[in-house]
Amino acid sequence: MNAPTVIILFGSTYGHTERYATWIAEDLRALPQAPTVELSPVAEATDELIQSADILIVGASYLGGFLTGAPTLRKRREAMLTVDRRLFYTVSFNGTEVYPRSYLDDRVLKSYKAEVAGDRPAFHFRGGLKMSEMSKLHKTALTGVKTAYKLKPRQNEYDKQLIEAFENGGADHTNRQWIDPLVDQVKIYLEELA
């Protein structure tokens, strides 16, 4: 019997979402009954690639109110619906440290629509910022945010982290251990397929 196929699609702005995709792939390939794992940027995903999956993992950067690559994947809705076992993850500077889980879950639902993402597991991780790679638009927007945070009479830890990241050229808050619950969910799917 052929090993199940896991396709990991990622929409990465500054590389953090891709890093999580790579870590997920490494952990899955290290399983005793390892599935076949393929990674692809969302922009390169085809219907055929998506339909070849037994398990589909979709990861996206959450930046400026949008999930990177979501509009592209909405065009692949029919292909995604052929894969029963789908799960999602988001990567943002603060993750669930600042955003309530329900807020990020809602971003997934709004971005991919309920028929694709509804009742599917969603995981949320912290990423980072790379000022040297940031577009002028993002830098301008973050300058306003940084200024507002600096003017707050009581800055929380995450306000301070954003200010420091901006002033130090970036920050990386990724943590490989955060993927463990996602990998555990994939293990459940793999057991169902066995």
Question: Which residues make up each language-model segment?
Answer:
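N-terminal beta1-alpha1-beta2 submodule of the flavodoxin-like/Rossmannoid cofactor-binding fold
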Residues: 1-83, 180-194
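FMN-binding flavodoxin-like domain, especially the glycine-rich phosphate-binding loop
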Residues: 64-194
